[in-house]
Design a protein with these regions (language model features):
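Polar, enzyme-active/binding microenvironments
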Residues: 1-185
Length: 185
């Protein structure tokens, strides 16, 4: 399937929700996992609280969170404990419905940059992965965009590319522990 949310730790990778194409196109609520050091197909982990695609995934070493999504647009954040198979639980909500933003984390703070709902967004929102609760606004990107990529290390998070409405090549960064508006990389 495609248009999934994903998150991982050093042992497991999780693939959540998305769209399946056989026998017909439909959204799914399934969560699958792989073991990083082994090859093979994904294995059933559990289910999301809702059927959704285009979620934004962030994680720590112990917890994965899947935020927002589409069909319909959603502000819901689900979470699972990565080491324990089972269904997702409610973590909290985004400040607004959103999908297809650029997610990243430093293992403590999960950040969602940009997105779409039903217009392109420039807001940056964050959660503390270890503490359930609603996301809060963190700053803004340099340009509204949907479908960007997100990546990070322990200090800096990057939101790159996307479309607004044509493809863009802008790379923004923030210092994860400080928040605030993004700076051009």
């Amino acid at each position: 399937h495609d248009r999934c949310g994903s998150a991982s730790n050093s042992t497991r990778g999780l693939i959540a929700g998305g769209r399946v194409r056989t026998p017909s196109t439909a959204n799914t609520n399934t969560i699958g996992y792989i073991t990083m050091c082994s090859s093979g197909n994904s294995i059933d982990f559990g289910d999301l609280t809702r059927t959704q695609r285009m979620m934004m995934g962030v994680s720590s070493q112990t917890r994965a969170c899947f935020a927002g999504g589409y069909n319909p647009f959603s502000d819901i954040i689900d979470y699972v404990e990565i080491g324990t198979l089972g269904n997702a639980l409610d973590f909290g909500d985004l400040p607004f419905a959103n999908q297809s933003g650029g997610p990243f984390s430093n293992g403590v703070t999960g950040v969602f940059g940009g997105g779409y709902s039903p217009a392109r967004r420039d807001e940056i929102t964050k959660i503390t992965i270890a503490s359930k609760g609603d996301a809060t606004e963190f700053g803004t990107l340099q340009q509204k965009r949907a479908f960007p990529g997100g990546c990070s290390n322990s200090t800096r998070g990057i939101v790159a590319g996307g479309e607004s409405p044509t493809q863009i090549n802008l790379i923004d960064y923030i210092t994860i522990t400080h928040g605030g508006n993004a700076t051009v990389f």
